[in-house]
Regions:
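Pepsin/retropepsin-fold aspartyl endopeptidases
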Residues: 1-159
Length: 159
């Protein structure tokens, strides 16, 4: 969410106990995140679903919730911040998005946390910068029922 971190960082998570600060944790099985408003060149201001994810137990990042993405995606710099590095065993793969443009990636397994739920998940570590942070389905959505409430402008993760 390069260039949009400011707006997203102003969001707070809400649990069933009410709104909490940006570093607070949900204490039960339900976590809500308000959508963020961003400018679209086609549609003006649009509301997009995001979630606060902790990567490798230390790095807090807002990610777009993308139910159409098979796998979570992070840019090169975020991978470096959480201590990822390429090894000889890593295979350089390519993933394709809208318009069939490809992105070079390496699949890595990392520790993630959403609310109080901690888990390991595979993610696609992009070898370029110009990609959004996407929270994809593989190894993440199996822990939660994910509901995008368009009218209420919130994303709800229930366990």
């Amino acid at each position: 969410m390069a260039g949009r971190k400011e707006e997203a960082s102003q969001c707070t998570a809400r649990t069933s106990e009410g709104f909490e600060g940006p570093n607070a944790r949900a204490s039960n099985m339900r976590v809500e995140f308000p959508f963020v408003n961003e400018r679209s060149s086609l549609f003006g201001i649009v509301s997009r679903p995001v979630a606060k994810i902790i990567l490798e137990r230390k790095f807090i990042q807002w990610m777009y919730v993308d139910s159409g993405a098979d796998i979570t995606l992070i840019p090169l710099s975020v991978g470096k911040l959480i201590g990822l590095h390429r090894t000889r065993k890593d295979r350089l793969e390519r993933i394709f998005g809208v318009g069939q443009s490809s992105v070079p990636i390496v699949i890595k397994r990392v520790h993630m946390q959403l609310g109080k739920t901690r888990f390991q998940a595979r993610l696609a570590w992009s070898q370029i910068e110009d990609v959004p942070l996407l929270l994809g389905r593989i190894d993440v959505f199996r822990f939660f029922d994910v509901t995008l409430k368009e009218k209420a402008h919130v994303t709800v993760f229930t366990r």
